Amino acid sequence: MIRIKNLSVPYDETRTPTELAAERLGVSPCAVHGVIVVHKALDARRRNGAPIRWNYTLDVTADGTRGILTRLRRDAQVGRAEEHGPLRVPPYTPQEGRERPVVVGFGPAGIFAAWLLARAGAAPLVLERGQDVDRRTRDVAQFWRTGRLDPASNVQFGEGGAGTFSDGKLTARSRDPRMNEIIEAFVAAGAPEEIRYLQKPHIGTDVLRTVVKRLREKIIEMGGEVRFGTQVTDITMRAGRIAALTVNGAERIPARAVFLGIGHSARDTYAMLHGAGVHMEAKPFAVGVRIEHPQDFVDRMQYGAAAGSPFLPTADYALTFRDEEGGRGVYSFCMCPGGLVVAAASEEGHLVTNGMSNYRRDAGTANSALLVQVTPTDFGGAVLGGIDFQRALERRAFSAGGGDYRAPVQAVGDFLSGRTGTKDFVVVPTYMPGVRPAALGTILPDACSASLARALRHWEQRVPGFGAADVPLTGVEARSSAPCRILRDAVTMQSVSAAGLYPIGEGAGYAGGIMSAALDGMKAALAFLERIQ
């Protein structure tokens, strides 16, 4: 098979990959028998007037492969395609007296730890404090409609984790070949095939709900068991290793291998683990607000005159700013093209935002978190101090919104000048169950507000309209990542203080996003399987 790299074509190119490959290789399309799109990325930088283009990597099956490779041997962009074999999964051999492994949490890390363990024949038991995705979707919809929060079933807790109510982005920095196993599992469960090759793949919250349900069904089919409404409320240790779990304050489950994928919002579980002697540390995170624009503004910002073309995807953006005066980084995060701002609280009397898009990204509005870095020195460095810091922000936001889960909202111009009252926004804030004008600067810490203000002024200079006076800001965004890290050995992936306990994913402080969390869960499961061989 031949690999063609860096095949660049206009964004509105209508020829098929087969025709493009044939032209690049100098053969007739009839000589090409198969083309796999390995990678497809949009170059919309438009530097020095350059047009927008798609860049492809293609794997091609063609007549006369040897001759083609010989003829093009000096062409650095054409060569023989690499081939990767399937992931080797060490088999699990049940032994008398050996408890089956337990997975705590059914977000991306927990799902793929359980998926790999089940594939190996280990028949894992999954314990998820929240509800299955169908019930969870109903509970969340009721919260958004009425303001009645279920602390056990919400945007943070339940099947699929917090990512179920997000944009479903599958971007990752890692080039680990095991990522392909995750992508293929998603596709087999109903995700669009384009996630195999797009540079910025996403599933969308609407499709993701079906995908996570099918992954659960596959785990059960392979011998696993999944229990919902089952919260781990205590752990038992013996001689420095995990021995058992207590669920819902009553049932005791013997366990000598526990994969801890609790998510970044399991604050009560963090406290329980810390009290039980599991070693943890405070870590940096970030807090801020959500900003919203009309999607066509973002499309014009990125595509210029080509905005609106059916050949181009809904545009996104990524912005960063180093606030030298305040000594903090400020950046956009979890940008949701064609999406909505959603209520993501998991505790009564607390308010937190998040962003969400469907697969088609057709809501007409774009939103992104704008976050300011926070370090342990901002909250005294205590292990659980970051949780207290987050809670204080969320309580202030809840109060500022009126105490009924409406979110505080403020126009950029008012935020920068310290006023409130503007109601004529460039786009109607999408947060449900609604918004209320408030001073976001009184909710965020002074240092964070100052850094955010300087970032908004900087971005408005770079991208006129981004920080315009009538652009709405909705707060508060406080759950971008875990506020602490559960310490683990770099090789065995077990807790440094509790043998047999495998902290995994975003909640353990070792991942950020669906793909990195899923990979972390897989790696921990592989480490366990290799250890017991």
Q: Which residues are covered by each model-predicted region?
A:
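Residues forming the flavin
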Residues: M1-I52, L58-A189, E193-Q533
